Amino acid sequence: MNRLPSSASALACSAHALNLIEKQTLDHEEMKALNREVIEYFKEHVNPGFLEYRKSVTAGGDYGAVEWQAGGLNTLVDTQGQEFIDCLGGFGIFNVGHRNPVVVSAVQNQLAKQPLHSQELLDPLRAMLAKTLAALTPGKLKYSFFCNSGTESVEAALKLAKAYQSPRGKFTFIATSGAFHGKSLGALSATAKSTFRKPFMPLLPGFRHVPFGHIEAMRTALSECKKTGDDVAAVILEPIQGEGGVILPPPGYLTAVRKLCDEFGALMILDEVQTGMGRTGKMFACEHENVQPDILCLAKALGGGVMPIGATIATEEVFSVLFDNPFLHTTTFGGNPLACAAALATINVLLEQNLPAQAEQKGDMLLDGFRQLAREYPDLVQEARGKGMLMAIEFVDNEIGYNFASEMFRQRVLVAGTLNNAKTIRIEPPLTLTIEQCELVIKAARKALAAMRVSVEEA
């Protein structure tokens, strides 16, 4: 690979990139050149801030680690040929593993026929995916709107709730502290981290936040809103807060919130973008309490780690506000054939291989190991928690969490922090992780903590 001059034309740049895409292997000099090139382009054309962020998850502050390809269902290989067990899972997109052959085959077969829809003829895979989700999701959820990401699925849910509740004079939304629902304007209004919110103030009016897991605070907020005429259109929350640090609510919390929503005539929106698709040991985390939302948000793992897709699924009663004019909320690429093919294949793999049950089994194994390490290293680890294959290790301060991620990188295990909680390291591997790989992850974590304790003692 010849290095492009800084004055290279768009044609030359695209040809250079296509040449890279065609390559299956890199020699040593090509690898070094590619690493330098990627770092330069991130700095000059993407965002230099990403380079600083990457330093927290690479050994010795060397942020030249550049991914090259999947090494298997559960591993990644960088340009230097180093293979990493993936315990980050692209923030939860690789539930069925990297390049799952069933998902890849479905997308390739659809690509050979028609990659994107005409927008005028009826597209069969969108209809089939909507039917499949109606059969898969809990309760009376029946109609699906498709988009490209989690934040888009939340935006659609908020607009759907507004359209349904506006004639009833209900305009207020209640979200929870520590919540993360995305960064577009509506979703950001429900998100609860000031770092993400302050630069874009004022956000949408009518959003209130109450402590997550505190049912009396939820009741008080709903009651006060009713007294002041600010009746609540919907409550939006995550069954388990992912970016908040993998925060689990008390048992029965979702059930109690469902009852409050029914009592006050508010819709219940569950954001299962991160907890859905088998991640917590059930297909959807709300199924642990048999709770049925009015609107359900999905994305991330829905596309099988091959295609981006989001979905907003609602009951017929709620979704029917869009029947008269289906163009009130649409997106060009939402529900495209490639994405729907990936989602249908993903659902098939999850069910055929019973991956939610595997997530429960292997998640218990990993969590037991992490909790044992927490007992062995109380000076470093505050707590290990989680459900299924969504886990977190919380350290006593941010710096220790940073060092743990770096040490795990040296052990060839990929982990990272959460967006709303810097001292918490998230463990979110593919559900296809093998028992042997689970054992290797626990072993790597023990080595990492031992090395960190030595560093602390020497300091």
Curated annotation (Swiss-Prot):
Gene3D superfamilies cross-referenced by the UniProt entry:
Aspartate Aminotransferase, domain 1 (3.90.1150.10), Type I PLP-dependent aspartate aminotransferase-like (Major domain) (3.40.640.10)
Q: Where are the transmembrane segments?
A: none
List the PROSITE patterns hit by this protein, alphabetically. Answer: AA_TRANSFER_CLASS_3 (PS00600)
Q: Which residues form a coiled coil?
A: none
Q: Which GO terms describe its biological process?
A: L-lysine catabolic process; putrescine catabolic process
EC numbers listed for it are: 2.6.1.82, 2.6.1.29
Q: Which UniProt keywords apply?
A: Aminotransferase, Pyridoxal phosphate, Transferase
Functional description taken from the UniProt entry: Catalyzes the aminotransferase reaction from putrescine to 2-oxoglutarate, leading to glutamate and 4-aminobutanal, which spontaneously cyclizes to form 1-pyrroline. This is the first step in one of two pathways for putrescine degradation, where putrescine is converted into 4-aminobutanoate (gamma-aminobutyrate or GABA) via 4-aminobutanal. Also functions as a cadaverine transaminase in a a L-lysine degradation pathway to succinate that proceeds via cadaverine, glutarate and L-2-hydroxyglutarate.
Q: Which family does it belong to?
A: Belongs to the class-III pyridoxal-phosphate-dependent aminotransferase family. Putrescine aminotransferase subfamily.
Any idea what this protein is called? Putrescine aminotransferase
Instruction: Name the species this protein comes from.
Output: Escherichia fergusonii (strain ATCC 35469 / DSM 13698 / CCUG 18766 / IAM 14443 / JCM 21226 / LMG 7866 / NBRC 102419 / NCTC 12128 / CDC 0568-73)
What gene is it encoded by?
patA
